[in-house]
């Protein structure tokens, strides 16, 4: 949905630099543009198809789009019922002043011009999932805190996604290893009353296109859900394929 341009704010992941984009740029506040698209889609569904849609959405994202979903939930918690996020366990936000955006909310008001809505955020059901072998693929351009190649899909080490010093502080506070960091993050969120779970899917990788990546499971789930939804819709209208 969103492109990634070199030397440009990381739109795909709602990086902090996205808030510095000029308001006359077509990509200004891309998150707010997505909200407008959602509202327009609701209007079309209701007015043109006569269907009733829920006030809040089911937000799904995997890998980069999972990171987008994490941050979109921070920015617009009032419109989300459930956030289903995969392959993004290294950068789970905590709505606290202990961290700055995109891992926390210390600078939230200065970036967005509004106060953080903790009540709405606390009403979101967060469901995280990640493959057991998520950290096995290594980057050829990033190193971890010990000088070794960093896990490719751990955004804590990717400065386009998480600013370098912010990532270092996160790892120092919550853990260098991604699964440990995620576990500690989940415990903090649970202590804050956030409805969150984190499932590790055994014997699965991030995405190697060989049939054992977690994303293949997600694609299958989405396709099956879409097909069953269309089938039920046609049955309710008295249609047959």
Annotate each language-model stretch with its function.
Residues 157-169, 176-241:
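C-terminal catalytic histidine-bearing segment of alpha/beta-hydrolase fold enzymes
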Residues 59-61, 86:
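Short beta-strand immediately N-terminal to the catalytic nucleophile in serine-hydrolase-like folds
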Residues 1-10:
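Conserved alpha/beta-hydrolase
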Residues 66-77:
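Short glycine-enriched nucleophile-adjacent loop
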Residues 82-192:
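The feature captures the conserved acid-bearing segment of alpha/beta-hydrolase catalytic domains
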Residues 46-52, 113-120, 188-192, 227, ...:
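Surface-exposed acidic, glycine-flexible loop patches that form ligand/cofactor-binding
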Residues 18-50, 57:
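Alpha/beta-hydrolase active-site loop
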